[in-house]
A protein has these predicted regions:
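Transmembrane alpha-helices
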Residues: 15-18, 24, 115-118, 170, ...
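Transmembrane-helix boundary motif in ABC transporter permease subunits
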Residues: 1-4, 82-117, 133, 190-192, ...
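N-terminal signal-anchor/first transmembrane alpha helix
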Residues: 1-34, 100, 110-115
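C-terminal transmembrane helix and the adjacent membrane-cytosol boundary/short C-terminal tail
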Residues: 2, 10-11, 181-192, 196, ...
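Interhelical loop and adjacent transmembrane-helix boundary motif
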Residues: 4-9, 49, 60-71, 237-283, ...
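Non-cytoplasmic
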Residues: 27-31, 128, 176-179, 217-249
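Membrane-interfacial helix termini and adjacent extracytoplasmic/periplasmic loops
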Residues: 50-52, 60, 128-169, 203, ...
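Short membrane-interfacial helix/loop motifs at transmembrane-helix boundaries
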Residues: 21-70, 134, 138-139, 144, ...
Length: 300
């Protein structure tokens, strides 16, 4: 009977695990295989053996080329930089917002959460194109800055790294807010009431109760924000210049413009490896936070 109980979770999880293997692991293995083909040489034509790659070949030439390609390392560096900056901005702006929503009365909380969620109901293209107009040389932002006398010429807010950061932050921050809010909702507010009853101020209660117990949720939100930002495509593609390319954008260009599938696949593998390393490094403090505060938050 005990063995059957131990087996039950695996039985329930089996369909999901199988689905993940089919939809994630198999395409990843195919991506690795394509990266080991010889390139098609940019010839005209379409399909396997045409201009994409030469089937049946095995080579590490693409990887050795990437290792010595300064262009690739510049793109990778910008991608990581963008991920870190966007994740930091999402946490800096998202935590206070989530905390504010958490403190709202119940009747206003649903409206505030709805306002966060509604930003994800429109198409990403519509959102970014709208932002492109807002950040344009003659858009509302530059018009206001000029009217207020803060600038004498339009600021370059689009086709720049600034525009990419703003756009990607706008796309990612709703997830950050929702994840942190969900973590805060698990906290027992009677702890704060008890602290106030003992004479603790709001700042002391936040620093010694709310913040420590919300650290696991904060760590999870940071990781999710970083993963989303590292895979940025639409924001750098529409709001950046050729100097603000991410790996996701260059993969698309290599595969569909240059028709060099092995290089595009190898860059995709590089992005996957980079993301895996960052997640592995992040897992160490995250696991420590879960051990130190996660169980305490659950049992408090």
């Amino acid at each position: 009977m005990k063995a059957r109980r131990n087996l039950t979770p695996w039985v329930w999880a089996a369909p999901t695990i199988l689905l993940l293997l089919v939809l994630l692991l198999w395409p990843a293995l195919q991506l690795i295989r394509v990266s080991l083909y010889e390139g098609g040489g940019g010839q005209s034509g379409f399909g396997i053996g045409g201009s994409f790659y030469k089937p049946g070949t095995w080579t590490l030439a693409v990887y050795s080329g990437l290792a010595s390609d300064r262009y690739f390392w510049e793109i990778l560096s910008f991608t990581v930089w963008l991920g870190v900056v966007v994740a930091a901005l999402c946490i800096a702006l998202g935590y206070p917002t989530a905390h504010f929503i958490w403190q709202l009365p119940q009747r206003w909380k649903a409206a505030a959460l709805g306002a966060v969620i509604v930003t994800k109901l429109s198409s990403l293209l519509v959102t970014i194109y709208g932002l492109k107009l807002i950040l344009g040389d003659f858009g509302p932002v530059n018009e206001f800055l000029s009217w207020a006398g803060l600038t004498h010429a339009p600021l370059r807010l689009h086709d720049s790294a600034t525009g990419v950061v703003i756009g990607e932050t706008l796309l990612v921050i709703p997830y950050t807010i929702l994840l942190i809010w969900a973590g805060l909702e698990r906290l027992d507010k009677t702890l704060l009431a008890a602290a106030r009853g003992l004479g603790a101020g709001s700042v002391f209660s936040f620093l010694h109760i709310t913040l420590p117990l919300s650290l696991p949720a904060l760590a999870t939100a940071t990781l999710v924000s970083l993963i989303w930002a590292l895979g940025a495509f639409i924001s750098p593609y529409l709001l950046g210049s050729p100097q603000e390319l991410t790996l996701a954008v260059d993969v698309q260009r290599q595969m569909f413009e240059n028709l060099h599938w092995p290089r595009g696949a190898a860059e995709g593998v590089g992005m996957l490896v980079t993301l895996s390393l960052l997640v592995a490094l992040y897992a160490i403090p995250h696991r420590w936070l879960l051990r130190k505060y996660g169980m305490e938050g659950a049992t408090a």
